[in-house]
Amino acid sequence: MNIALISTSSRKNSNSLRFANYVRHVLTETSQHDVSIVNFENYDIPFVGQGSVKKDSLTNFQQELISAWEGADLVIFAMPEYNWTAPPQATNTIHQLGGPAFKHLFENKVFAMVGISNGRGGRQPALDMTTVVNKIISFTNSYSIVSPKLYESHETDKNLDENGQFIGHEVYERTARAFIDYTLNVSQRWLAPNLVETK
């Protein structure tokens, strides 16, 4: 399975990137998956009302993001929680890529959402992004699904080191792996050949 991990924090060495690296380590324990990470450190998508993303003049960051996303069967967003909501870069990305020019990014995909916190938060950004992505899937009449299981990465900096290696409490490791397993199972069921829309 092709899997894109999208770390939506623009901070250098963010907790969201730690989590994305952790998921990559878990997924590559076997050779069953091709995994890519996109880091929002060089984010340059204009905000709605200030410009748009043009297919024929993508920046390096935009090209990296769109290439990883369009080649993926499963797209996992890792989002920091800012004041009980998702970061603006995350939702703006969906708004800017949710139109006709990039409709294919929402076709025959499984999406999964992870909220990242250095405390006990994380739920709200995952819920916010679930709502926005579901709306785009519905509005564009696309055949994709957002996996119903969210993950809240609590005390991320205490459980994962800067390279995404697990260093923390066994409950974190157990619940994170359960989320990954569940997400993979949903993806395998959703992407079964008899369910994929014939073009």
Per-range role (PLM):
Residues 2-31:
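N-terminal beta1-alpha1 ligand-phosphate binding loop
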Residues 142-199:
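Glycine-rich phosphate/pyrophosphate-binding loop and the adjoining helix
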